[in-house]
Amino acid sequence: MIAISHADAYQVLLLQAADDGRGPQLFGESLARAREVAQPFMVGETFPSVYLEHPLLGDPFLDVTILYGKLEPGIRIDSPMAPACGEMLEWHVRANSETENVCCGFELDTKDPSLPVAAVHCQPRTHIELVEPFCEAVGEPERAALYLSMSERMPEEWSLSFFGMFRGRPGSPLRVCGYLPKDEVEACIEPTHLAERFREIGFSAYDDAMLGQVASLMAVAPGTVDFQLDVMGDGTLGPTFAIDAQFEIAQPEAVCAAFTDGPAARVMGLLEKYGAADERWHLVPEASFARCIPAEAPDGKVGRYSFTLMPQWVKARWTNGVMQPAKNYFLAKAGMLETKE
């Protein structure tokens, strides 16, 4: 009977996703880098939430986002992509002991061999009081003011929930994000309503064509929609706007139907029509899977260990009103389901 580490599970998830020739088509040569550089980030008693991000148009590559829920004190990550992150991890331990449903983590860019320092991510949700201590913990205290100022001027229906940044890059934007209520998504199907929201928040890098594309995608979005904006160092908004359309597929066995003639297929088909995706999106259900194998738990008990990879959302993005290549996001999960003596 084998014991499976988080690093082992991560390798299984990536290799299975890339099997049957899908690796070169979906992830390109960065797959090998993603397999290697993410291993030091597989920390904690529980397997983290791992998101695999790949484009649906253009040269294939794979980026990896790793988000942590509960972490144990004293955990460190030994990676040049996450220098001096100990204070951030200790902050996260304290925040989770005091507040529920808070997560933070890293986004690993493996597209190029140079491997830049990972971006950091924080999801305070409604706990706005956590923004300043997080930014201080990652050595970017001035970013907190940008988030808090932006949060104050957002309409209630466009409230902020999470943000990300590159440390040590003074000119890089702060990415702020939030979830749109269902009623607001339905309202944004009307381009004039969407344009009014953009004017309220101070976003001007759009045209009528972009409004129509955003509205049409919201009309076919299967479930939750979140938005993303870039806040520049002077507090103004950058030229990029994005939405994530959640697939909300409940079970692995439902993936194929969703991508054949269901809600996911309608979203992907629209992205292909707009020139933001090509036929590779049809490989997404083929890469999805769920498996269980016998394994030994850390306490020596025997049980079933599960591996699951499912598509979670697709990102549509516009810069200066021009639609960019869309990206698909898989959620990779692993862990013991049950044990017995």
Predicted regions and their residues:
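Internal, hydrophobic cores of structured domains that mediate oligomerization or house catalytic pockets
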Residues: 84-197
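Broad, structure-driven detector of short, well-ordered beta-strand segments within folded domains
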Residues: 48-66, 100-113, 159-165, 216-235, ...
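An N-terminal, globular interaction/scaffold subdomain
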Residues: 1-115
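Extended intrinsically disordered, low-complexity coil regions enriched in Ser, Thr, Gly, Ala
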Residues: 68-96, 126-142, 184-206, 254-276, ...
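C-terminal structured domains
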Residues: 192-341
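Short, hydrophobic/proline-enriched secondary-structure or compact coil segments at domain edges
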Residues: 46-48, 52, 58-77, 114-122, ...
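Surface-exposed polar/charged interaction patches
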Residues: 16, 20, 37, 44, ...
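Exposed alpha-helical structural elements
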Residues: 9, 26, 33, 129-133, ...
